[in-house]
């Protein structure tokens, strides 16, 4: 069973990573691979073009143009850091990779995947060079008008390879719709289970973006801590007050709810 997460816009290359944490190379990051092909396209654009393409400020555009120029075909401890430690945002606050033991990180490496506009798919310990390229970016390429066309069935096919040894392949989607859309459902040979997180607001339950993002990371963390092997096992998820709501759920859509106070 694999868990899919979205990446984060904000990055942390300052907080030290424990020295005993190993590092691996991303699957699609060969010098002439898909990631390098995208970097080549991005390097052809000016800061103003990047600003318009990604709706960034002048300062952020200049920063990312510099990042594209500095990007190399292979991440090293000097120019990159492990994805689960580099991404910094609500999801990764919930995951809290720094508090996981080496054994837990090893399990996460086998069962947690991070979708990425530039890298396609990352494992938590894959080396990540600084970048900005959201999956929804309309970056024209030889495959089509955007990154969904660029990645095509490649992400789904790689997931199939990762799941090939599982008797009943399952993908647990705790990524945003923008990112999960990059997984070609027709090519994916696995059952997909979606997890939804709702808060009690006023007189009903509803999804609150900030809390939902953190909850996605929390669920991935819980799965790592408990080595969750089936969707049924996820029904016991209970971090930070969430509980499984059987009446609101289906076999393919697990709903977790909580009330404050």
UniProtKB/Swiss-Prot annotation:
Stated name of the protein: UPF0246 protein Vapar_1301
A GO term from the CC aspect: cytosol
Organism lineage: Bacteria, Pseudomonadati, Pseudomonadota, Betaproteobacteria, Burkholderiales
Transmembrane segments: none
InterPro entries assigned to the protein according to its UniProt record, in alphabetical order: YaaA (IPR005583)
Superkingdom, taxonomy of origin: Bacteria
GO annotation terms (biological process): response to hydroperoxide
Similarity section: Belongs to the UPF0246 family.
């Amino acid at each position: 069973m694999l868990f899919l997460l979205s990446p984060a816009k904000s990055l942390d290359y300052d907080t030290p990573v424990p020295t005993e944490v190993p590092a691996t190379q991303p699957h699609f990051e060969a010098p002439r691979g898909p990631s390098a092909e995208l970097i080549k396209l991005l390097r052809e654009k000016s800061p103003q073009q990047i600003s318009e393409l990604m709706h960034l400020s002048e300062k952020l555009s200049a920063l990312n143009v510099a990042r594209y120029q500095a990007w190399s075909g292979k991440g090293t401890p000097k120019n990159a850091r492990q994805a689960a430690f580099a991404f910094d945002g609500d999801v990764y606050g919930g995951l809290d990779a720094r508090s996981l033991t080496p054994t837990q990180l090893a399990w996460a490496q086998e069962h947690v995947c991070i979708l990425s506009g530039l890298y396609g798919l990352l494992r938590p310990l894959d080396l990540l060079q600084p970048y900005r390229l959201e999956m929804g970016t309309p970056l024209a390429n030889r495959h089509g008008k955007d990154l969904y066309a660029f990645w095509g069935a490649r992400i789904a096919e790689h997931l199939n390879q990762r799941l090939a040894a599982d008797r009943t392949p399952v993908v647990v989607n705790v990524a945003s719709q923008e990112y999960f859309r990059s997984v070609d459902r027709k090519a994916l040979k696995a059952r997909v289970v979606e997890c939804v997180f709702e808060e009690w607001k006023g007189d009903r339950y509803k999804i609150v973006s900030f809390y939902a993002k953190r909850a996605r990371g929390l669920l991935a963390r819980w799965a790592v801590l408990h080595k969750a092997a089936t969707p049924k096992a996820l029904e016991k998820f209970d971090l930070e007050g969430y509980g499984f709501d059987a009446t609101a759920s289906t076999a393919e859509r697990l709903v977790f709810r909580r009330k404050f106070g």
